[in-house]
């Protein structure tokens, strides 16, 4: 190797340093984006150490989704102000992406926790549980709405949760009023709800009261049978049903094969006779 290139990196050395394939360096040279500092007549190429920083900037922009054509314009006509503007712009995009990933992680962790709890649950059991007050995001009233408006109300609820970035991975639940339960109207929820994180104003919240609830389970959409068993349990213990029942899936079709294999949890308010 001649004296003038001993302090330079060969293409192979520079590609290893930058953790890319040699073909990437060849391609960048072909499109005029990034070229070796020295090109010999015999075809050998050499890169200087200070080119590493330039390549890092190219890699950074590429990782941020900037097209190579745009990167070329930035690199060739770069000024401190222009690069600073792009870096600040991309920094904002990264912050947004980080927040999105954090929310996704929260959603996934909730799904993991709920599924683990479901796998440890005896779905044939019925019990009384004292529950603390809990706040949910509530749909508009859906009782007796025409089918398309019923569906629209659910869509509105989901849209609001997404709009305010309140989703934590909890399932959509449904509320039956006492009158519906007594009349065995189990196919027409009064409201839908979702448990969400705090932080949004001017949205419709519902507070599930603290108190005693009968907790049972619905298997494969067999709603009427599930409520019959729970009500019998309540009455055998000298109690009566309260104002509302809250239903939400523990194992839905995301984790089981077929609707007939789904499991829903029912929380039915109870009170003394």
Curated annotation (Swiss-Prot):
PROSITE patterns linked: HTH_MERR_1, HTH_MERR_2
DNA-binding region per Swiss-Prot/TrEMBL record: 11-30
An annotated Gene Ontology molecular function: DNA binding
A GO biological process held by the record: regulation of DNA-templated transcription
PANTHER family: MULTIDRUG-EFFLUX TRANSPORTER 2 REGULATOR (PTHR30204:SF85), REDOX-CYCLING DRUG-SENSING TRANSCRIPTIONAL ACTIVATOR SOXR (PTHR30204)
Keyword Ribosomal protein part of the UniProt annotation: no
Record function comment: Activates transcription of the blt gene in response to structurally dissimilar drugs.
Taxonomy, superkingdom: Bacteria
Family matches, as InterPro entries: DNA-bd_dom_put_sf, GyrI-like, MerR-type_HTH_dom, MerR_fam, Reg_factor_effector_dom_sf
Name of protein: Multidrug-efflux transporter 2 regulator
Matching CDD domains: HTH_BltR
Assigned keywords, A-Z: Activator, DNA-binding, Transcription, Transcription regulation
Domain HTH merR-type: 8-77
Species in which this protein is naturally found: Bacillus subtilis (strain 168)
Pfam families, alphabetized: GyrI-like, MerR_1
């Amino acid at each position: 190797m001649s004296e003038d290139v001993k302090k330079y990196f060969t293409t192979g050395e520079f590609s290893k340093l930058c953790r890319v394939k040699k073909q990437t360096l060849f391609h960048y040279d072909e499109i005029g984006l990034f070229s070796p500092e020295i090109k010999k007549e015999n075809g050998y190429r050499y890169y200087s150490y200070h080119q590493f920083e330039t390549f890092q900037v190219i890699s950074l922009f590429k990782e941020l989704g900037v097209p190579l054509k745009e990167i070329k314009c930035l690199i060739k006509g770069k000024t401190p102000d222009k690069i600073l503007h792009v870096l600040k712009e991309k920094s904002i995009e990264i912050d947004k992406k980080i927040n999105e990933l954090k929310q996704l992680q929260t959603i996934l962790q909730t799904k993991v926790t709920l599924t683990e709890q479901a796998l440890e649950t005896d779905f044939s059991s019925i019990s009384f549980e004292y529950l603390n007050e809990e706040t949910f995001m509530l749909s508009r009233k859906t009782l007796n709405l025409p089918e398309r408006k019923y569906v629209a109300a659910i869509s509105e609820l989901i849209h609001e949760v997404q709009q305010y970035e309140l989703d934590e991975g909890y399932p959509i639940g449904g509320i039956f009023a006492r009158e519906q339960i007594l009349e065995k109207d189990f196919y027409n929820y009064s409201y839908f709800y979702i448990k969400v994180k705090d932080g949004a104003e001017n949205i419709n919240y519902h507070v599930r009261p603290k108190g005693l609830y009968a907790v049972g389970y619905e298997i494969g959409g067999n709603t009427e049978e599930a409520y019959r068993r729970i009500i019998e349990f309540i009455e055998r213990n000298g109690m009566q049903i309260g104002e509302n029942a809250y239903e939400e899936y523990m194992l839905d079709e995301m984790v089981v094969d077929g609707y007939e294999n789904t499991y829903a949890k029912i929380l039915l308010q109870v009170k003394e006779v």
